[in-house]
Structures are given as structure tokens and as C-alpha cells.
A protein has these predicted regions:
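Extracellular "spike/adhesin" assembly and maturation modules
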Residues: 1-160
């Protein structure tokens, strides 16, 4: 599986840009945007929870769960027209909590899993920061296993 991407540097400049573009579309129409602005608007504004964010988070959860051999149901086919329900976002948060718990004994340097709803840039940043840190811890463990030769003498291919 390809390396998952993580976005956890959303800030209020991103929020201001989203508001600016939205107001411009409302007042002057979508066609008033430059090609660059249309691309930003069409492909997921960084400060807005959108299908690309949800798919990226779902994919990261899937990759991490596979590495840890944790069975997990994830959704990675969100579309622009789908609006996640409260139970959808709670399912995402539960998955993130499960993955965080799996490496809790290796690090305490992670934010808390936010509460539902995921409706602020801080909460979105925390979700992806947790996934990034879990993925990083797993890679450190795998690297250390290879250095000590453990991967060559194990009788199975389990990570931990």
C-alpha cells in the first residue's frame, strides 16, 4: 500500500481563504474564480472537512490497521455529495482511538482523540496528527526489529 498522507497544519488563514472563496462565489459566481482558485475549491479546501479529508483519514486507518493486523472497517469512497452523519464521524473517531490505543505503551506524545462532532480545524488536525504519530511509531518499531534481526527469526509475520 502506498504511504498514507497526513494533513495536520490547518490554521485560520485556511479558514479565511475558504470564507473568501465562498463569499466570492456567492457574490460573483463560480466562473469569477481564477483557474487556481477553482482548483482549490473543487479539490477540497484545507480548512473544510470534505470528501478528500475523509477518504485520506479512512485510507490512513486502513494502512495502519493492516500493519497492526487489527480488523477494522473503514470508508474510503466518500463523494462530494455525501455528508457524514454523527454515527459516521463517531465511527472514524472510534477507529482512531483503537489505533492510538494500540501504540499507547510506546508514546504518550499524542493529543486526545477529539469528541464528536469533528467540526473545528483543531479537531481535524488532532485526528490526523494522531494517525501520523501512530504510523511513525509503527515504522520505528519495524525499523528496530530489522536492526536487531528479529524479522528474520520470527516464526510468523506479526508486527508485535
Amino acid at each position: 500500500m502506498p504511504y498514507p498522507e497526513f494533513v495536520f497544519d490547518r490554521d485560520y488563514f485556511d479558514v479565511e481563504e475558504a470564507i473568501r472563496l465562498k463569499e466570492r462565489i456567492r457574490s460573483d459566481g463560480y466562473n469569477s474564480l481564477t483557474d487556481e482558485e477553482k482548483n482549490i475549491w473543487d479539490n477540497g479546501l484545507k480548512a473544510c472537512r470534505n470528501a478528500s479529508d475523509l477518504n485520506r483519514i479512512g485510507y490512513a486507518c486502513s494502512v495502519i490497521a493492516d500493519l497492526l493486523e487489527i480488523p477494522m472497517t473503514v470508508k474510503t469512497d466518500w463523494t462530494k455529495l455525501q455528508i457524514p452523519t454523527s454515527s459516521d464521524t463517531q465511527h472514524i473517531l472510534d477507529n482512531v482511538q483503537t489505533l492510538k490505543n494500540s501504540v499507547a505503551s510506546y508514546t504518550t506524545d499524542m493529543p486526545n482523540v477529539p469528541s464528536n462532532p469533528i467540526n473545528t480545524i483543531e479537531k481535524m488536525n488532532d485526528v490526523e496528527k494522531i494517525l501520523y504519530k501512530v504510523y511513525t511509531v509503527i515504522n520505528i518499531i519495524l525499523t528496530d526489529m530489522c536492526v536487531c534481526g528479529e524479522t528474520y527469526i520470527c516464526e510468523d509475520n506479526r508486527l508485535i
